[in-house]
Each structure stands twice: as structure tokens, then as C-alpha cells.
Amino acid sequence: SHQSMFETFFLQTIFNSPVFILKKELLMIPIFVWYLKKIGSIYINRNKVSKENINFFEDISKIIANTDRPIIIFPQGTRVLPHEQPPFKKGASRIYEELKIKCQPVAINSGYVWPKKGKKDINKTITISILEPIKPDYSKEEFLGILEKTIYSELKLLN
């Protein structure tokens, strides 16, 4: 789940140098773009089919084959408020199906401490749940349903 900027920084510390999949629009944010490039993020242009998008799966496949770096994608496609539950975007399921890799769902309630909009509340605690991996045995439709149910069910417990 993606509720705040917290995940972008903290997940670097608990996973082994992950590769973030991000929307191209984030490359327009000064200073943040430097950080995203420094950690080896890969972007995708969600608005159109392009040559760079065609090479996207090839780039991810190379990373998986040549390193042990996990891939992180926020399936909502954007930050959401803590009680929002928008349907997940199909991009995560396309990566899952194309690469035939397991998925490690993570639920984080950081939106209460570092919200998308508004003041930070340092008196609250952020909880991170690393959930059971989803094996690469499902269709992309089944996977997306399982992923969404798994993460949103856990967030209800955390909130």
C-alpha cells in the first residue's frame, strides 16, 4: 500500500536495495528525481504505449537475472488516504504474469503519521506488515484479486 512518502525511503532499509517501479511523472520533482535515479528506479510512461515501455519488461528481467534486488511497485499507482481503497492498477499483475515471480505483499499504515495532504503527526506509530508471499501460480486477474484482498484486509487490522 502507498499512503505517504515514508514508504519510498523506509522500504530501502528493510529490503535489499530494491528497484522501485514508478510513474514517469515523478521524474519531474526536483531533488527527488536525483534520489530515484541514484537508487536505480525504473519508470514507466502510463499514458501511452512507447518504445521505452516496450523495453520495460526486458529491463526488469535483466535486473532479476543479474542481481538479487527485489522489485517494489505500489499497486494503487499513487498515494492514497488511509481509508481509501481504490482498485489496484493492472501494472503489478502484468509484471507478475510476465516475469513469473512471487510477490511479497506489504501493508503500511503510514498515512496516519505522514499523510498525503496535511500535517505530520509524530505521536502516532507506523506499522509495517510483511505478508505471506503470493506464488506465481495464478492468472493476472486472480493475482490482482488476491493481492488487493490481502493488502486491504491487513490495512483494516492496522487502522
Predicted regions and their residues:
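Catalytic core of membrane glycerolipid acyltransferases/transacylases, capturing the structured
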Residues: 1-49
